[in-house]
Amino acid sequence: MNNTIETILNHRSIRSFTDQLLTAEEIDTLVKSAQAASTSSYVQAYSIIGVSDPEKKRELSVLAGNQPYVEKNGHFFVFCADLYRHQQLAEEKGEHISELLENTEMFMVSLIDAALAAQNMSIAAESMGLGICYIGGIRNELDKVTEVLQTPDHVLPLFGLAVGHPANLSGKKPRLPKQAVYHENTYNVNTDDFRHTMNTYDKTISDYYRERTNGKREETWSDQILNFMKQKPRTYLNDYVKEKGFNKN
């Protein structure tokens, strides 16, 4: 097993960072690593906003659900779906492509491009001995996040990425068994296979939480996920995404 694979398999989310900020060189390396990710048809439909202003980080921390590691980290990055530059290019050349930019396919392209870039950055950061934590909470109140970051139409903040020097290492959460996520040639809908896999995984997760909390928590993955799914969804996003110029047709 090489160092790259070891880094990937050793991933865990870090939610406690030291006060040490990333250097300009480290930030540059991380951004270059993100840019090296694959991109659909060379469109590069994403942007990264680095947030170093302490007040902006504090505001984003509150908007993300009062998550302290949004404010206290080595550097905070926000990954955005970005079709603004493409719209600007078209306008400068007298082309009219708004309807094309605002369709579902381009929305999906921008989402995937941003996610690929972010994962490249994450792996690069962890290979440098840094820790990372993805922050989906910025989608709680995207209209206010947009104000903080001053993003124009055709730019949509998707998630944050806190990066820094770990203050402590959390345990690695067991992932779903391979047979739950990998299907050969066709999707496996066998009910018995599903039930066996989920029961086995639920016991693994229950044992993990019991050991981690000295018996104070024994929640299964099934219970955890179903409870999460029943929480109030961000239903406003459907309209807001369209308002920002995405997924209109």
Swiss-Prot record:
Keyword tags: Flavoprotein, FMN, NADP, Oxidoreductase
MF terms (GO), sorted A to Z: FMN reductase (NADPH) activity
CDD domains per record: NfsA-like (cd02146)
InterPro entries membership: Flavin_OxRdtase_Frp, Nitroreductase, Nitroreductase-like
Class of this enzyme: oxidoreductase
Family, as annotated: Belongs to the flavin oxidoreductase frp family.
Protein name stated in the entry: FMN reductase (NADPH)
